[in-house]
Design a protein with these regions (language model features):
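Extended, low-hydrophobicity segments enriched in charged/polar residues
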Residues: 23-284
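Aromatic-enriched hydrophobic runs in primary sequence
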Residues: 4, 27, 155, 169, ...
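Long, compositionally biased interface segments
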Residues: 275-336
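N-terminal signal peptide c-region/cleavage motif recognized by signal peptidases
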Residues: 16-18
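Cleavable N-terminal signal peptides
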Residues: 10-11, 21
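Sec-dependent signal peptide recognition
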Residues: 2-8
Length: 336
């Protein structure tokens, strides 16, 4: 009996280690998202998908934004190009080789804020060839490590298609409960013209000082970007690979709304009784899908207003890469 019990315990331990190894298997992910001109008359939801940024992995901000350390007083941005003098105030975020040590999970705390350009380029990549590290977090790869060149060239030749985002990264795959979504955003920032809910901005404080009720001045709050494409992509293992998309594509249009008034003076009751007129409006077009996929296969998520091409590839696991980054053989990580 004791021997059978010992065998059973050993089997359970082996299975648990096997499941853990499978759950932590690393894969390479490549994503291409494009907008297409459509004559679709489909009615889209009035409310955009809520963009969750409190628990996501952000691989894009450290590349396209200027990292600013939040301090009691205004500080200069921590540039992404190494400059010892310019970055002396934020040296704790820099490695000795000049590369940024900003954690892609840093937006899960209040340590790092970013200033962004008005338009984000479609091609997102690291400055050089990158590889994941054992027990590390997802890592952005260079554009040269991607494999979608011919696909992108073919789709770009189709009339009405416009590239929004192309990026490649490596990440460990975990169960759904342990997975953390990847933040995807791209295109134009509409925050200077529209609110997140789509309403046209009539009067805006921007970053100028404004007077409060007792006559003193306070700074207007920082305006969060309203990106043309924004949302998350979650990939996880549950015997098979699954992807979950929660993306908004924002497009300028027109909508019957109460006549616009001064944002500072309008009341809810007044806006409800005001006559409706055709008003500029920022539409929110959702791409929400949950799909089971197979590794190595190229999958296309179709939509009337956009398209998404994704491939999840098996790769040499980080421990093997660290020993020989030039290895040509691919280590098998399971029948996914």
């Amino acid at each position: 009996v004791l021997r059978q019990l010992a065998v059973s315990i050993a089997t359970l331990i082996a299975l648990s280690h096997s499941q853990l190894a499978r759950a932590e298997a690393w894969f390479e992910v490549e994503v291409y998202i494009f907008e297409r001109k459509s004559q679709s008359t489909e009615q889209w939801p009035d409310t955009p998908i809520a963009t969750k940024t409190n628990r996501v992995i952000d691989l894009i901000s450290p590349v396209v934004g200027q990292a600013v350390t939040p301090m009691a007083t205004e500080s200069a941005p921590c540039t992404l190009v190494f400059d010892a003098e310019a970055n002396s105030h934020c040296a704790e975020n820099l490695n000795t080789d000049g590369t940024s040590s900003i954690d892609p999970l840093a937006n899960m705390s209040d340590r790092v804020e970013y200033r962004y350009p008005s338009v984000i380029p479609a091609q997102i990549g690291s400055n050089g060839t990158q590889y994941g590290s054992a027990k590390g977090e997802p890592i952005l790869l260079s554009t040269s490590q991607g494999k979608f060149s011919s696909i992108i060239n073919s789709l770009s030749r189709e009339r009405g298609n416009r590239s929004l985002l192309h990026m490649t990264w490596q990440q460990p795959m975990r169960t759904k409960n342990g997975s953390v979504p990847i933040r995807l955003f791209a295109g134009k920032d509409f925050s200077g013209t529209y609110h997140f809910d789509g309403r046209k901005i009539v009067q805006q404080a921007l970053n100028e000082s404004i007077s409060n009720t007792n006559g003193s001045t306070v700074s207007a709050p920082a305006i969060s970007p309203v990106w043309e494409l924004d949302g998350t992509l979650n990939i996880y293992l549950n015997h098979y690979l699954y992807i979950e998309t929660a993306l908004n594509l924002r497009k300028e249009g027109r909508k019957m709304l109460p006549a616009p008034t001064d944002d500072a003076n309008v009341s809810t009751s007044a806006s409800l009784t005001a006559p409706k007129v055709m008003t500029p409006y920022l539409m929110a077009i959702p791409l929400e899908q949950n799909r089971r996929i197979k590794s190595e296969e190229i999958h296309y998520l179709d939509h009337p207003e956009m398209g998404m091409v994704i491939q999840i590839r098996k790769m040499a696991q980080p421990s093997a890469q660290q020993q020989n980054q030039n290895a040509e053989s691919i280590q098998t990580v399971g029948q996914y």
